[in-house]
Regions:
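Residues at alpha-helix caps and immediate loop-helix transition turns in enzyme cores, especially N-
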Residues: 4, 8, 70, 94, ...
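Active-site phosphate/pyrophosphate- and oxyanion-stabilizing loops and adjacent acidic/basic residues
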Residues: 10, 100, 118, 188-189
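Short hydrophobic signal-anchor/transmembrane segments that target glycosyltransferases
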Residues: 182-193
Length: 193
C-alpha cells in the first residue's frame, strides 16, 4: 500500500484480483516501538476488516508482524486461518516467533516442503490439515513476460550496471543488530577481494 515500498497492491490488481479492503498500518519508523504500534494499528484495522467482510476463511502468507496482527484479529473474530509457509525457520530473526505463532493460530496449513510439513505436525497440528504444496511464489518465475533485457532492467531500477554485475541480498538478524553489522561487513570484504 505504500509508494516507498513499490505499491505492490497494484501488481495484485493487475493480476486480476479485486481487493475488498485495505489495512494501513505502517509507521514512519521501523524501531521496535514503532513496530509494536504498527501491530496495534493492524489489530484495529484487521478486526474491522474481518467484521465487515465476514469471510469463511482468512488466508495468511508468511511471518511478518503485519501477518501476525491479521492472524490475532482473525482468531479473536472467529475467522479460521489457512497459513501458507509455516514450519520454516529463520534463525536470529523475530519472524521465527511470528511464523510459529501464526501456525499455532491456524486451522489449516500449506507448507512449501515435506520437511516443513513435518515440523508443523511436530508443533502439534493435525496431519490431516497440513499440506505440502510447494512455494506459491515460485510459479511466477516460469513466466516469460517477467524476463527483462539488461537495458529494460537498468531503466526499471534507474541504475546503469557495470559490464559484470553481481546481485547480493542479505537478510539480517533482527534479534542481534551488532552481529548483522559484522556479518554484512564480512560480505563486503569478501566481495572486495
Amino acid at each position: 500500500l505504500c509508494g516507498s515500498f513499490g505499491m505492490t497492491v497494484r501488481e495484485i490488481e493487475a493480476d486480476g484480483f479485486h481487493i475488498d479492503k485495505t489495512v494501513e498500518i505502517l509507521m514512519a519508523s521501523d524501531s521496535p516501538t514503532a513496530t509494536s504500534k504498527a501491530v496495534g494499528l493492524g489489530m484495529i484495522g484487521y478486526s474491522e476488516a474481518w467484521a465487515e467482510l465476514s469471510p469463511d476463511i482468512g488466508v495468511i502468507l508468511g511471518d511478518r508482524f503485519e501477518a501476525m496482527a491479521g492472524a490475532m484479529a482473525a482468531v479473536i473474530a472467529g475467522v479460521p486461518i489457512a497459513h501458507i509457509h509455516g514450519g520454516e525457520t529463520t534463525e536470529g530473526a523475530i519472524d521465527e516467533a511470528f511464523r510459529h505463532s501464526i501456525t499455532k493460530m491456524a486451522f489449516m496449513h500449506f507448507t512449501s516442503t515435506d520437511r516443513y510439513r513435518e515440523r508443523v505436525i511436530q508443533m502439534g497440528e493435525d496431519p490431516r490439515k497440513v499440506f505440502s504444496v510447494g512455494a506459491p511464489g515460485l510459479d511466477r518465475l516460469d513466466r516469460p513476460d517477467l524476463l527483462r533485457t539488461r537495458s529494460e532492467f537498468e531503466t526499471e531500477i534507474e541504475f546503469k550496471l557495470a559490464e559484470r554485475a553481481v546481485l547480493v541480498t542479505y537478510h539480517p538478524e533482527t534479534l542481534d543488530h551488532e552481529a548483522s553489522e559484522k556479518r554484512f561487513a564480512e560480505i563486503l570484504r569478501a566481495l572486495e577481494s
